[in-house]
């Protein structure tokens, strides 16, 4: 059966019953239909925090490696083992759903449901973010049109518009055409909604007041004297925040095995910080003995950003890290072409395992216990599985092979046991670089300790920006690296575990509301395009409302 068929064949429990499993009362949730709900915060009484398990992965193939599937399967396995566990996941972006991925709610018998709703419009959070973002864009252009009291320079507006769609044609636009009554002409463009700073702000805010403070700090551009102008200067922070008053509340759903899952926020890890909301993770920590969460793409992206950007705000470090690896991805990193990934090749697998070992070493830099989860595919041979298990065992790291796609939580019981054991070990969290280190120090530490590179090289533009940032005190904010997810380098074609390479930073983007500076490397894009055969071509809906083509 296909993922969507498995999902549709499962009878879901009422969301009130799922809420009751973790002690949430009727007045603490706002149902959206029968199987989804918003959680009203703060919870009535503070509860002790449970254990936190972060799931990340190696560098993926373009098809993805089933990290979300393993997260769901692990959560179900922990619940089967008698440990009350709550998942904390990111919300899928409609762009990749209609583009390459076709869905992002796990797979097989390890899914969060209702998968159609979650993958499509869900509870409207993405739309609220899009409207709030574009309302701010309209207010900026209206201010310029209506006298421009702040003396905003139309050539230096940094707030682009957004859509939750992959649309390369909108990357660069010209607006304000049509005469004096149609605005001031200027160059503009669109990003995808999950790249919006508002998404990062929402995911890092601790409550509604913090959200408004962060919104007011957002940089929108510069004035004619090259001085920064913020949302607070425009005096519209309250209006933007009120558009997000419901979106800030975490969403409660369930797994196929009727265990609770909180889904909230969805920044990409290659162009943003790649973690679900602090509020969702904090809520899960209060509701469960264990919280299993994930960070986008590999440990070099989402994993690093969880540790360096989210953890300081969350106020809790992971008790264990799970790195998901697949045999096909390691063969891909070992030089096998995509068309040949289902053919047994132990030698390429062993060569590609250097990528996994690099990620293990990277996460060990933080002083947190690491467990490797092999997400087994039907094409994987016994010889390949044994070879990979031996590679990991040789470096004294616990490893478990999972079959969660086929078996749900039952396929991750060994992994669950090893994760529980790991969380009982001492965790000595260590920062990658000193607190308040300058941007160059942080980027160099990430390049050397996480990527395995040698140095960071700045473009002429990036060097000029650093000098400007120093004037305003932005040069000591945390850095958020925007980099390809397919390689440890900034070149998607350099697979495996390259060494002594250079990371090239072409420009910086201050995200003052989120509290970090994005360093854009290589040719990473903030508005993706659709592939030659978008997943949307295979989607349909029957007269009775049955959806097909999501996966």
From Swiss-Prot:
GO annotation terms (biological process): tetrahydrofolate interconversion
Catalytic reaction(s) noted: (6S)-5,6,7,8-tetrahydrofolate + formate + ATP = (6R)-10-formyltetrahydrofolate + ADP + phosphate
Gene3D superfamilies given in the database record: Domain 2, N(10)-formyltetrahydrofolate synthetase (3.30.1510.10), Formyltetrahydrofolate synthetase, domain 3 (3.10.410.10), P-loop containing nucleotide triphosphate hydrolases (3.40.50.300)
Involved pathway(s): One-carbon metabolism; tetrahydrofolate interconversion
PROSITE patterns: FTHFS_1, FTHFS_2
Annotated ATP binding sites: 61-68
Keyword Cell membrane annotated: no
A GO MF term: formate-tetrahydrofolate ligase activity
E.C. number: 6.3.4.3
UniProt keyword annotations, A-Z: ATP-binding, Ligase, Nucleotide-binding, One-carbon metabolism
InterPro entries associated with the record: Formate_THF_ligase, Formate_THF_ligase_CS, P-loop_NTPase
Database matches in Pfam families: FTHFS
Family in the record: Belongs to the formate--tetrahydrofolate ligase family.
Protein name: Formate--tetrahydrofolate ligase
Organism: Levilactobacillus brevis (strain ATCC 367 / BCRC 12310 / CIP 105137 / JCM 1170 / LMG 11437 / NCIMB 947 / NCTC 947) (Lactobacillus brevis)
Gene, per the UniProt record: fhs
């Amino acid at each position: 059966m296909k993922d969507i068929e498995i999902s549709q064949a499962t009878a879901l429990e009422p969301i009130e019953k799922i809420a009751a499993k973790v002690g949430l009362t009727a007045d603490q949730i706002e149902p959206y239909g029968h199987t989804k709900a918003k959680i009203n915060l703060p919870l009535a009484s503070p509860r002790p925090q449970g254990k936190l398990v972060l799931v990340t992965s190696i560098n993926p193939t373009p098809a993805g490696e089933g990290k979300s599937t393993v997260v769901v399967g692990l959560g179900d396995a922990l619940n089967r083992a008698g440990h009350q566990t709550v998942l904390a996941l990111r919300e899928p972006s409609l762009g990749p759903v209609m583009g390459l991925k076709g869905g992002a709610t796990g797979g097989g018998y390890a899914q969060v449901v209702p998968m159609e709703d979650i993958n499509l419009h869900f509870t409207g959070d993405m739309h609220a973010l899009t409207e709030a973002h574009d309302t701010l864009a309209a207010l900026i252009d209206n201010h310029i049109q209506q006298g421009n009291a702040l003396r905003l320079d139309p050539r230096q507006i940094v707030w682009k518009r957004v859509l939750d769609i992959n649309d390369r044609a909108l990357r660069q636009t010209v607006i304000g055409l049509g005469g004096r009554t149609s605005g001031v002409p200027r160059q503009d463009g669109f990003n995808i909604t999950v790249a919006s700073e508002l998404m990062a702000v929402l995911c890092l805010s601790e409550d509604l007041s913090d959200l408004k403070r962060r919104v007011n700090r957002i940089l929108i551009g510069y004035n004619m004297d090259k001085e920064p102008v913020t949302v607070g200067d425009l005096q519209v922070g309250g209006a933007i925040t009120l558009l997000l008053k419901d979106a800030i509340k975490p969403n409660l759903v369930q797994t196929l095995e009727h265990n609770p899952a909180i889904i909230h926020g969805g920044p990409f890890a290659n162009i943003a910080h790649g973690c679900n909301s602090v509020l969702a993770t904090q809520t899960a920590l209060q509701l469960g003995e264990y919280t299993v969460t994930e960070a986008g793409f590999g440990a070099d992206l989402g994993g690093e950003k969880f540790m360096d950007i989210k953890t300081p705000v969350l106020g809790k470090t992971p008790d264990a890290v799970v790195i998901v690896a697949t045999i096909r991805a390691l063969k891909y990193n070992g030089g096998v072409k995509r068309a040949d990934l289902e053919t047994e090749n132990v030698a390429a697998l062993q060569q590609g395992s250097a990528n996994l070992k690099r990620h293990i070493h990277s996460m060990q830099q933080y002083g947190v216990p690491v467990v490797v989860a092999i997400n087994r595919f039907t094409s994987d041979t016994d010889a390949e599985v044994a070879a990979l298990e031996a590679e990991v065992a040789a470096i004294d790291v616990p490893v478990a092979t999972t079959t969660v796609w086929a078996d749900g939580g039952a396929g991750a019981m060994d992994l669950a046991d090893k994760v529980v054991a790991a969380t009982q070990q001492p965790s000595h969290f260590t920062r990658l670089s000193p607190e308040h280190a300058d941007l160059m120090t942080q980027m160099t530490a990430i390049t050397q300790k996480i990527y395995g590179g040698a140095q960071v090289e700045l473009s002429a533009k990036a060097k000029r920006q650093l000098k400007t940032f120093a004037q305003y005190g932005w040069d000591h904010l945390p850095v958020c690296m925007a980099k390809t997810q397919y390689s440890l380098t900034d070149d998607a074609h350099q697979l495996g575990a390259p060494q002594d390479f250079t990371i090239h930073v072409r420009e910086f983007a201050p995200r003052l509301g989120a509290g970090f500076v994005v360093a854009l490397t290589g040719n990473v894009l903030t508005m993706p395009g659709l592939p030659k055969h978008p997943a949307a071509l295979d989607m349909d809906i029957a007269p009775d409302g049955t959806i097909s083509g999501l996966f």
